[in-house]
Amino acid sequence: VGPYFLSFAGDRRRVAYAPSLAHTNCRPENFDEQLVSELLSRFDFLSVREEETVPLFQTLVDAPIDVVLDPTLLLDSDDYADMASKDVLQGEYIFMYLLRECPELIESTVAMTEATGMKVAYISDKNLDIPNSINLFGVGPEEFVSLIAHASLILTNSFHATVFSVLFHRPFRVYATDKSGARMRDLLSNIGLSDRCVDVMCADDIAPCEWSDVDSRLDSLREHSCAYLRKALS
């Protein structure tokens, strides 16, 4: 595990920016506490992405552990404008992106396309049983960002699909109810969008969002994260 903790850096300054456990079922009994404590103690600055992971690691080090934004959120939609300029699909569509299997998300997608009449675009290594849908292949970062930027609705259990939905002010719903959803729950809570995290949904759930408030909160979090970097790198 040494390289993951920058063991190759010698006596140089070590800065951890927004590392993520992704899953919150990590417990001290699942790793060598003494080893991790020794490795973390070599860092000059420590931060994490999820609030829920701070108590876990704070027991291992005396240094403060900050909570900062995912690097993709340090930029705004203008910075991603070129990536989003490519039109992948024409007309209105629902973009459904599964990072992990989620039958509830697929069921809700089927219900939404039947209720709205909009087609569904999704990315998967297998065809899903969703009417009026298209499985997109060969989708790279630019196409991914563009699909979100131009979608009428995004349904996902992916953190980064959530990030770009927020940045581009798109209607979205997130399925983040399991242990792997801590990053999404933290982000949505911090920007006042916890109600976008759902178990099931229907067409009536697509309520408008007060994006000015979201942007204001995100700007504050962005400034906090940049201040952490400025301090760590100065």
Regions found by a protein language model. Give the residues of each.
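Active-site anion-handling motifs in enzyme catalytic cores
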Residues: 1-234
